[in-house]
A protein has these predicted regions:
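Short, conserved non-catalytic motifs in the polymerase core
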Residues: 1-15, 41-47, 97-101, 120, ...
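Active-site palm subdomain of RNA-directed nucleic acid polymerases
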Residues: 13-42
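Catalytic palm subdomain of template-directed nucleic-acid polymerases
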Residues: 39-63, 122
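Hydrophobic packing residues in well-ordered alpha-helices of helical domains and bundles
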Residues: 51-54, 58, 72, 127, ...
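Short, conserved micro-motifs composed of acidic
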Residues: 56, 71-108
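Charged boundary/loop elements
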Residues: 67, 75, 167-178, 184
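Basic, alpha-helical interaction scaffolds
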Residues: 101-171
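Short linear motifs embedded in intrinsically disordered, charge-biased segments
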Residues: 178-212
Length: 212
């Protein structure tokens, strides 16, 4: 390799983290780093000043990349505005972020480290994402339930379904009860499939009987 870090190497991740460690000092943005993923956060009282300062800080960030002979992936770089006001149309129309003469796309939601963040912070997109995973898991378990024992089905559920429910729960778990009920309904369906129980069977009783 002439540049970069070999994928799968033992020292690669550590060397990369050391190399980019001072990125947090190149601007006044609050940085959240994980491996080669970064979220940069800036807040301000007024929208106008927010846009102005963010463009200034983005220029500093771009200079850091040039100095360190790195390239910022502008296609994967997005900007999202969190705002208290319900009417956000003026933000979508007026907000502009430019890096190296490229306009950065503004989005209403984005997936970061496995969690879908939305600009309203109602977590609806993430709930839908988990629901899709649970539905897929339910389909797999339904097809296999007559061919494999319940212990294997439970292992499949923990790997393909339950892991999504537990992941980052401290963040999105504050959603409304209506959203949680949607997930609970899907989970109950899977539990009934795993234990070969009729669809109207009380799930609480199933859990006690099966020690789930």
């Amino acid at each position: 390799m002439l540049c970069g870090v070999p994928q799968g190497s033992v020292l690669g991740p550590l060397l990369f983290i050391i190399y980019i460690n001072d990125i947090v000092n190149c601007s006044n943005l609050d940085a959240v780093l994980f491996a080669d993923d970064a979220a940069l956060v800036l807040h301000h009282k007024t929208f106008k000043q927010l846009q102005k300062q963010l463009n200034v800080e983005a220029t500093k960030l771009n200079k850091w990349f040039i100095t360190n002979k790195l390239t910022l992936n502008l296609k994967k770089t997005k900007v999202m505005v969190f705002h208290k006001r319900r009417n956000k149309k003026h933000i979508v129309k007026k907000f502009r972020l430019n890096i190296n003469r490229v306009n950065i796309e503004q989005v209403n939601h984005i997936k970061y480290l496995g969690v879908i963040l939305d600009n309203k912070l109602n977590w609806q997109k993430h709930i839908d994402y988990i629901s899709t995973k649970l539905n897929r898991t339910a389909g797999i378990i339904f097809k296999l339930r007559k061919q494999v024992p319940s212990k294997v089905l439970l292992l499949i559920y923990n790997s393909l379904g339950s892991s999504y429910l537990r992941y980052a729960l401290m963040a999105w778990g504050t959603v409304r009860n209506t959203a949680l009920r949607k997930l609970q309904t899907l989970q109950n369906k899977i539990i009934r499939y795993m234990t070969h129980s009729p669809l109207m069977t009380n799930v609480t009783q199933i859990k006690k009987r099966s020690r789930l």
